[in-house]
Amino acid sequence: MAEEHDEAVRVAELRKKRSFRTFAYRGVELEQLLDLSAEQLVDLFHARARRRMLRGLGPNASRFIRKLRKAKTEAPLNEKPATVKTHLRNMIILPEMVGSVVGIYNGKLFNQVEIRPEMIGHYLGEFSITYKPTKHGRPGIGATHSSRFIPLK
């Protein structure tokens, strides 16, 4: 009788324990992504990002990554690093950038974005919209032929 009760308690504890989904980019977990060499990482990217990486990131992107590393090392333990501002909207998000806070320029101001694992392989510009989405109001006079019959205010 006691064995059945212990078994029931153990099963209840297992159900209670929440399992969190670990992030995987193309089947490779984040910890393993950080350990991959540049060539192995490039093989995981989609064609456009792969071509960009093979042609080289360039001096501006390298300088940006150095600033991100510096901000991460200077950040206190268990705190977000300082924001690193950039105009590089065409920068591909790499695994080492995860956890950083980036100010992405949209043509007018810098939008602060915290880099999450789901963003790997995307461009920075995808997370800072450059236009203000329209909010359509009521149609004005002359919008359509039927608007002639709408009484004026």
From Swiss-Prot:
It comes from the Eukaryota. InterPro entries: Ribosomal_uS19 (IPR002222), Ribosomal_uS19_CS (IPR020934), Ribosomal_uS19_euk/arc (IPR005713), Ribosomal_uS19_SF (IPR023575). Signal peptide: none annotated. It is found in: Cytoplasm; Nucleus; Nucleus, Nucleolus. GO terms for biological process: cytoplasmic translation; ribosomal small subunit assembly. GO terms for molecular function: RNA binding; structural constituent of ribosome. Its main location: cytoplasm. GO terms for cellular component: cytosolic small ribosomal subunit; nucleolus; nucleus. Keywords: Cytoplasm, Nucleus, Ribonucleoprotein, Ribosomal protein. PANTHER family: RIBOSOMAL PROTEIN S19P FAMILY MEMBER (PTHR11880), SMALL RIBOSOMAL SUBUNIT PROTEIN US19 (PTHR11880:SF2). Component of the small ribosomal subunit (SSU). Mature yeast ribosomes consist of a small (40S) and a large (60S) subunit. The 40S small subunit contains 1 molecule of ribosomal RNA (18S rRNA) and at least 33 different proteins. The large 60S subunit contains 3 rRNA molecules (25S, 5.8S and 5S rRNA) and at least 46 different proteins. There are 2 genes for uS19 in S.pombe. Belongs to the universal ribosomal protein uS19 family. Component of the ribosome, a large ribonucleoprotein complex responsible for the synthesis of proteins in the cell. The small ribosomal subunit (SSU) binds messenger RNAs (mRNAs) and translates the encoded message by selecting cognate aminoacyl-transfer RNA (tRNA) molecules. The large subunit (LSU) contains the ribosomal catalytic site termed the peptidyl transferase center (PTC), which catalyzes the formation of peptide bonds, thereby polymerizing the amino acids delivered by tRNAs into a polypeptide chain. This is Small ribosomal subunit protein uS19A. It comes from Schizosaccharomyces pombe (strain 972 / ATCC 24843) (Fission yeast).
